[in-house]
Amino acid sequence: SQAVRQFLPTNGTSNFTDISADKQLLVESITAKGAAIRDRFQVLKGVMLPTSAGIFSPEESVKRIDVAYSFVQSLGLQLKADSLTGTQVKVNFNGQVITLDDNNEIPSNLRGYVQLALNLNLINAYFGLAQGPYDLTPTMKASFKPDQIVSRGDFAVIATRTFNEWTKALGK
């Protein structure tokens, strides 16, 4: 459901020093500028980010923050996400707007991606109640857990939710 253009460097080299030849097409394609089919002018960043310059880290686990970035990026929403850089990520719970307790754990440049992923219901926030010893009523709390590893089952749910957003745009 998250269409990605195929890409290989035309000079025959690889942009990454840690991938094998059999993985080069996939890694180069998902990290290339303009990777998302939704990026009609091929100017946006890839749908996955390298872990550092020239390093993809193919054996590294994927975290919730990575998934939020990738799925929002695959929908072609980079400019909207970038416009939210540095803002406090918030969620709505029964009409109450709650700022995430773990905002400081979300890199400033990725907060817009998390905000959009939450707004589009691609990925969920975690909710809980907190009550001090003298508080008459509990307070609703929310967090994102950006560094939590995503299981295959979690990934399947998020991919399915992303498909719904993809098809909405096709009907316009």
PLM regions: where:
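N-terminal propeptides
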Residues: S1-K172
